[in-house]
Amino acid sequence: MATHFSPRKTSKQDARARARKVRAGLPVLESRPAALLLSAPEVKSATTIAAYWSLPHEPDTHELLNFLKGEVRILLPIVLADWNLDWAEWNGEELVSKKGLWEPSGPRLGIAAIREVNVIITPGLGGDARGARLGQGGGCYDRAFKLAGITPWRVMLLHEEEFSSIDLFEDVHDERVYAISTPTRLIRIP
């Protein structure tokens, strides 16, 4: 039986530690929530999508990105020293491993490139029915969401066990997502 992520209203640091422990116990490649996104109207009509290349214990994005390449413009992030996200276009070329993350090797487009996207597919450690997102703690995506504005559809990928029925704690700078995709459902946030 899987352990479910159950955040209490304590510190976000404690919630992240619990979420990472749950995630570490999940089988690698068990979760493919990205597959549900292919039928979402927001993805079907998109011309530019910002996404990320998932790591082993994250919900898998590889199949989705490989399916979408050539169909839409894909931007992948590059984490800068100040924790902002720069972006580069990805067309299927080999990625470069930097600081434990996979980054595109093409020309950097700048942090403002996020303003060109229709959809932002974001990672997270947990989420709730309000669209609150527990990230890794650097605020990278919160800043990217603010820079992008409210128009791009923001969707977070989670393992089923990482969706919380309890409201997550939020700081004033936290930005919410508009949907959460798990392997079994696409949860639209009202």
Regions found by a protein language model. Give the residues of each.
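Aromatic-residue hotspot detector
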Residues: 99, 127-128
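Short capping loops/turns at secondary-structure boundaries
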Residues: 110, 133-134
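Surface-exposed, charge/polar-rich loops and edge strands
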Residues: 1-12, 21-25, 70-71, 105-106, ...
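N-terminal active-site beta-alpha-beta segment that forms phosphate/nucleotide-binding
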Residues: 2-116
